[in-house]
Amino acid sequence: MQGGAAKKGVEIHGQYEAIEWVEPAAPKDERERAIIESDWQEAFIQKGGMTCWRERSYELFSGNTWETGQFDRVVFSGSGDARQAVIYDFKTNAKREGESVVAFENRLRKTYEGQMAMYVASLAKLTGIPQNRIEAKLLASATMSVIPVRTSTED
């Protein structure tokens, strides 16, 4: 990322990191209203016993490699053997001139599928949740869309 884009990314991460859950009946500001009116609500409206991690750093030793990373947002649901998780990663990439939403989403999927596969594997090691019960999704700020990412661990 270059200067301006990096600064924008840090600002956006900071804004969304501050939000644990959005109350649909009482949004606190325009940002929360935008979440409620978009697909992002799946990541920010708490249902049942959901819990979340926000900007959670981790370190682990995997094979012969020391791995460090940071999850933007992980939402957990269920318990025991039914526990599952969704990893959400904020992306501030801009749509290119003339690029359709579908092309933009496909570009982001392709660009970040390796990163998201690493996050899925890491979360499984850290939590004991099997990889087949962990989903990976991108939250694209340019379109306020949720972009599912297939990882190599999925069937």
Model-derived regions: residue spans:
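Nuclease catalytic cores
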Residues: 1-80, 112-121, 125, 137-147
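Residue-level detector of conserved, well-ordered beta-strand and adjacent loop positions
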Residues: 55, 88-89
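A short beta-strand motif that forms part of the nucleic acid-binding face
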Residues: 90-94, 140, 153
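Short beta-strand-loop-alpha-helix junction that forms the active-site gateway
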Residues: 90-108
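Short glycine-/polar-rich loops that comprise or flank the Walker A/P-loop
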Residues: 132-134
